[in-house]
Amino acid sequence: MQKIRKGDKVVMLAGKDKGRTGEVVQVMPKEDRAVVRGVNVVKRHQRQTQTQEAGIINKEASVHLSNVAIVDKDGKPTRVGFKVVDGKKVRVAKRSGEVIDG
């Protein structure tokens, strides 16, 4: 089970976007990376194809999972733990003890 999943609201802990929050768009568990909406935006030069025109586009690049943390209810970053509730393994915020997904 992953600690950070698609749709989670996360905050950046390090890098040029430190402190910014965003929603996880994609998680790549084999590479330990995630794509976060509005964070780590880079410019890519795109070649013209039949469907798309050439130009410079802004695209979100992936960030390492160690540089993101889930945002708790009070808006501060929290670590994630696991607990068994009613025979199901659920994610729990270490800061508040609340179940993240349920």
From Swiss-Prot:
It holds the Pfam family KOW. GO terms for cellular component: ribonucleoprotein complex; ribosome. One of its GO terms (molecular function) is rRNA binding. It comes from the Bacteria. One of its GO terms (biological process) is translation. Keywords: Ribonucleoprotein, Ribosomal protein, RNA-binding, rRNA-binding. SUPFAM superfamilies: Translation proteins SH3-like domain. Coiled coil: none annotated. Part of the 50S ribosomal subunit. Belongs to the universal ribosomal protein uL24 family. One of two assembly initiator proteins, it binds directly to the 5'-end of the 23S rRNA, where it nucleates assembly of the 50S subunit. PANTHER family: MITOCHONDRIAL RIBOSOMAL PROTEIN L24. This is Large ribosomal subunit protein uL24.
